[in-house]
Amino acid sequence: MGKMRVRFPTLVLVLGIVFLMAVSIGIAYGEKDVLKSHERPEEREQEEWQPRRQRPQSRREEREQEQEQGSPSYPRRQSGYERRQYHERSEQREEREQEQQQGSPSYSRRQRNPYHFSSQRFQTLYKNRNGKIRVLERFDQRTNRLENLQNYRIVEFQSKPNTLILPKHSDADYVLVVLNGRATITIVNPDRRQAYNLEYGDALRIPAGSTSYILNPDDNQKLRVVKLAIPINNPGYFYDFYPSSTKDQQSYFSGFSRNTLEATFNTRYEEIQRIILGNEDEQEYEEQRRGQEQSDQDEGVIVIVSKKQIQKLTKHAQSSSGKDKPSDSGPFNLRSNEPIYSNKYGNFYEITPDRNPQVQDLNISLTYIKINEGALLLPHYNSKAIYVVVVDEGEGNYELVGIRDQQRQQDEQEEKEEEVIRYSARLSEGDIFVIPAGYPISINASSNLRLLGFGINADENQRNFLAGSKDNVIRQLDRAVNELTFPGSAEDIERLIKNQQQSYFANGQPQQQQQQQSEKEGRRGRRGSSLPF
């Protein structure tokens, strides 16, 4: 019992010493952490970064990190959606600037313009030093208001002098128009081959499934062709099938099996590969021999053609029918007949389905409009046709009037209804815009403006002008109806309607601006006449 009494104080002493040691160790570690937290930021960041450098970040981790930081850690390529958003914001900014410059009040809701497609909205399909082929994005991608155009696409290709676009066929009907230079187009069918010479303003239909190739025989001018494509298999999508293999495109023969090819050509596969498909090893050797630069220039679907080959390809080609009755297969010129509307401010040419058998079954019309600098194509609308318009040359702007969706009106019953919407945009070469049926439109040319139009659902379409002395539907309203329709008196309405003596095209400057311009020129003339010399 005495021994237990002696050991108990000793045990308590030992436990106390252990407790003090534990507390001392905890304090020491705490001081170490405090010292570590006061290290230089560079050293701490470097220490924290070391483990991350052991493996590269994934694209997902990089995007998440950029979102957390608020800005990307390095410049990255914009996606197609981001580019579209950027262009839409640019167009909206241009519209606001345009309204401020014009100084006119806007009675329309502020909307982005889904009917205008800048030239930047084309997607390149093929490109090399000899030319390029590109296609406009689908019309219905931007708005469901253009759903009826989902099976129509715009294709453009450009090629340098003395070049050839290799033979191909497509699962789409084409209606093409030459907008610059000259072309020789050969269409091949099972029983015949026909070549046509096309010049500026000539149009031609290439039926779906027909093998064709396009030559630029000119020594100086570039060739520019715009095509309206109407896909057959899948609405809005079409494909080109090439018999030859290039760096841009595989031959459709390469899709068949070895046994099928040998049975088809009754020849060994090695021979077929050498003649048609091409041997990859030989192609690589040929590229090295000629040099990579020359290879990049010649390889592809657009190739250089010699003078001798051009003479053979153009020898038996037929030209446009001119003012004769259009044939079932040959080219026709959009300006071969007299314009349907014409005055000193512009000309309007049109080929309707009933006047040309090539576009009759497609229910398509073609228009070519020339608006002189400073002139205005008066407001009008189409009764049935939807027009896809290509800006061939020049600059200007247009105003398109639409109506707000009925669904939006229901959702906004408590708001003041502003049903009329004005879509406007500046136009430059290569732009595309759509004119829906029934939507009034006017086009103003700031320089000589040339427009090519494809009319969809064009049979029995009627163009109704809203101003001018001829074909003016407002002018045909009864006098009594005018009094009931407009706030002005019948006399005022009649005087206003008859005030515009021009038809179809007119001076784009308001009368007040014309008077101010005349007064400025008069004052300038008087000052000039008073000079001492």
UniProtKB/Swiss-Prot annotation:
Coiled coil: none annotated. Gene3D superfamilies: Jelly Rolls (2.60.120.10). Residues 37-51, 79-99 have a biased composition (Basic and acidic residues). CDD domains: cupin_7S_vicilin-like_C (cd02245), cupin_7S_vicilin-like_N (cd02244). Glycans are attached at residues 363, 444. Multimers. Give rise to a complex array of processed forms, due to a large number of processing sites and changes in glycosylation. Belongs to the 7S seed storage protein family. Seed storage protein. Accumulates during seed development and is hydrolyzed after germination to provide a carbon and nitrogen source for the developing seedling. PANTHER family: OS03G0336100 PROTEIN-RELATED, VICILIN C72. This is Conglutin beta 2.
